C-alpha cells in the first residue's frame, strides 16, 4: 500500500525493493489520474531492483528474519510483518481494517507491536469533507483500524 512515492524515493536510494507480485503489478498499472507515461516510469524505476515476497514465505534481510502475513485491507496484497533478531520479535501492521485470528496468532509472543490506527469513528462520521462512500470504505473490515 502507499507505494506512490517509490519512484521518486528510488532516485536518491540505491536499495532493493521487497514487494509482492500483486503489489508490484498494482503499482505499475497506470491509473486514469496518472499521465505522461507514469506507468512506464514506475516500471523502469523498479526494474532489476525488486525482491518478490509472499505472505506465506519468510525471508531474511541481513541478520533479521521477516515473517509476513496477510492483513485485511482494500489494497493489493497487504502484509503485516514480524521481524525477528536474536530472539526478539517486533510486529508492524500499518493499513488494516480489523484484527483477525491470523493477526492474533502472529502477534502472540511478540516483544513489541507497532500498529497504525488513524481515525476516530465519531470524527470520521462527522467529517464534512469525506464522501459517504469513502467513510464506508475506511470504516469497513478491509479499511482502516480506528483509534
Locate the predicted segments by residue.
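Short, structured coil segments at secondary-structure junctions
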Residues: 12-13, 46, 109
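Active-site neighborhood of divalent metal-dependent phosphoester bond hydrolases
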Residues: 23-50, 83
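Short hydrophobic/aromatic-enriched beta-strand-loop microsegments
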Residues: 16-21, 49-53
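Glycine/Thr-rich phosphate-binding loops of Rossmann-like dinucleotide-binding domains
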Residues: 3, 27, 123
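Cap/insert and terminal regions of metallo-dependent hydrolase folds
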Residues: 101-147
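Short active-site oxyanion
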Residues: 12-17, 90
Amino acid at each position: 500500500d502507499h507505494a506512490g512515492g517509490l519512484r521518486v524515493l528510488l532516485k536518491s536510494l540505491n536499495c532493493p525493493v521487497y514487494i509482492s507480485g500483486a503489489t508490484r503489478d498494482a503499482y505499475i498499472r497506470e491509473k486514469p489520474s496518472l499521465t505522461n507515461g507514469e506507468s512506464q516510469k514506475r516500471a523502469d524505476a523498479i526494474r532489476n531492483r525488486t525482491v518478490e515476497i509472499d505472505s506465506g514465505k519468510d525471508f531474511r534481510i541481513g541478520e533479521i528474519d521477516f515473517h509476513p502475513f496477510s492483513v485485511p485491507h482494500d489494497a493489493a496484497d497487504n502484509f503485516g510483518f514480524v521481524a525477528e533478531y536474536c530472539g526478539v520479535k517486533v510486529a508492524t501492521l500499518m493499513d488494516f481494517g480489523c484484527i483477525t485470528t491470523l493477526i492474533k496468532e502472529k502477534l502472540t509472543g511478540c516483544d513489541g507491536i507497532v500498529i497504525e490506527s488513524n481515525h476516530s469513528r465519531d470524527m470520521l462520521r462527522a467529517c464534512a469533507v469525506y464522501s459517504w462512500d469513502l467513510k464506508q470504505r475506511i470504516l469497513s473490515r478491509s479499511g482502516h483500524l480506528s483509534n
